[in-house]
């Protein structure tokens, strides 16, 4: 399964659902954010 918006992810892009990317700009966690 994939991770939705604001869900925690690792640095791997694949963790997030389609249309989202893994954003690590706010440590300590990486969160999935919308590509738009």
From Swiss-Prot:
It is found in: Secreted. InterPro entries: Beta/delta-agatoxin_fam (IPR016328). Keywords: Amidation, Disulfide bond, Ion channel impairing toxin, Knottin, Neurotoxin, Secreted, Toxin, Voltage-gated sodium channel impairing toxin. Disulfide bonds join 2-17, 9-22, 16-32, 24-30. Expressed by the venom gland. The modification Asparagine amide is found at residue 36. It comes from the Eukaryota. Signal peptide: none annotated. One of its GO terms (cellular component) is extracellular region. Coiled coil: none annotated. GO terms for molecular function: sodium channel regulator activity; toxin activity. Insecticidal neurotoxin that induces irreversible neuromuscular blockade in house crickets (A.domesticus). Modifies presynaptic voltage-gated sodium channels (Nav), causing them to open at the normal resting potential of the nerve. This leads to spontaneous release of neurotransmitter and repetitive action potentials in motor neurons. Belongs to the neurotoxin 07 (Beta/delta-agtx) family. 04 (aga-5) subfamily. The presence of a 'disulfide through disulfide knot' structurally defines this protein as a knottin. This is Mu-agatoxin-Hc1a. It comes from Hololena curta (Funnel-web spider).
